[in-house]
Amino acid sequence: MSKQYETVIGLEVHVELATKTKIFCACSTEFGGAPNTHTCPVCTGMPGSLPVLNKQVMEYALAVGLAVNCQINQYCKFDRKNYFYPDNPQNYQISQLYLPICHDGHVEIDTPAGKKKIGIHEIHMEEDAGKLIHDEWEDCSLVDYNRSGVPLIEIVSEPDMRSGDEVIAYLEKLRLIIQYLGASDCKLQEGSMRADVNLSVREAGSSELGTRTEMKNLNSFKAIARAIEGERKRQIELIEEGKPVVQETRRWDDNKESSYAMRSKEDARDYRYFPDPDLPPVVISDEWIGNIKSRQPELRTEKMARYQEEFNLSEYDADIITGSKHMADIFEAVTAICGKAKEAANWLMVEAMRLLKEHDMDPEEMTFSAENLAKLIHLVDNGTINRTVGKEVFEKIFAENIDPEQYVEEKGLRVVNDEEELRRVIEGIVSANPQSVEDYHSGKEKAFGFLVGQTMRSMKGKADPGAVNRILKELLG
């Protein structure tokens, strides 16, 4: 009988903070600038340059720590993590090892077995490295230091997760908390949220941890789930074959759905940490912590409760809408403009979610304006267009953020209410479908629906459904 194994997973989640300037200098953190245009002597490691801590980085780190139930180190320090790599111009990274800003927190996730608490070992602040570019020249790599010195927090979990599903639930919970705080946009595709997966397997029932590996290059939740499954199987196969699992860092190739070894996995002592002599310790007062708490924005749980109370949404609807901060922001903006909360929720939950699924997009990637969705709701509500045409218009809003009023006029999509025209078209449909007329008179209600559908198709969806039903019933007798 084959052995049963348990997967043990911990995560190191790196989050780029939404500050306008870097952690230790005044250079811009804007994404996508020309290479090496957001740099200065500090973030490129020039001799004699001195770092100055960005206060906003501290405030974001504290806000995240408080939101995930952490204890705050009211006396924290920065340390130097020493290593040599081309994208690290100082040959060390300023981080926190001995006294990180936050420790001993947790978040709760939903699992099939119920609520599960995932421990957070610590949160520390650090600076990001530069970026190596390998595809510009054949015989060398280039370095872009725009990212060097961009502020990060690293959220280190306890090894409390046991499956890919639990990992994704944890990451989604973290992402929502951080987005609602405004601390980061957490866009995996742009690298503002990155997760390294530490994974080991052991025999079910054992309390002894196996040898862990670290998985890198994971830029989507789907890639993370696939990497976990692939690494779990790889380690089990090694154990079954009597081979050792090597403690190493591995790079995931999502196209090949496999990983390869990058280097042996380092321990803290390999980096020869020591206190940074250029940065004084930071003392965090009770007053400062209280001020952060008092300014903390509405998080998802409170927003859900408010939507049910203020907008009379069901718990299910409120849960779906608040599942993305961007979608919740659009919902509130649309509702503020048109005053129709349930209609706004319906368009977002049904049509927007359908298109997101079709295009394999995250809600954060939606670019249409709240004003245009509010205009569409008004056009449908006042009968200018029917809902069928409204869906067509929404697809254009979703894809191109078009002005729906202008689009409806240009394409001639207004509802046809002219009784004579409707009667003429319906008479033609009735004459062309004698079998359906006979079926209707023999009690087959589906035949009526067929005739309505033929009428709407003939009029390209622009007919008033109520008028079509009324006139058709008159003609059928």
Segments and roles (model prediction):
Residues 363-374, 378, 387-457:
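Strongly charged, low-complexity linkers/loops
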Residues 1-298, 315, 336-340, 350:
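Basic, nucleic-acid-interacting segments
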Residues 301-308:
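Extended, structured, electrostatic nucleic-acid-contact surfaces
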Residues 18, 198, 202, 233, ...:
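Amphipathic alpha-helical core segments of compact helical bundles
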Residues 337-338, 344, 352-367, 375-380, ...:
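M16/insulysin-pitrilysin zinc metalloprotease superfamily fold
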Residues 445-477:
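Short, amphipathic C-terminal "tail helix"
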Residues 268-270, 304, 358:
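Active-site lining segments that contact anionic ligands and/or coordinate catalytic metals
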Residues 190-203, 308-330, 341-358, 371-373, ...:
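Core structural elements
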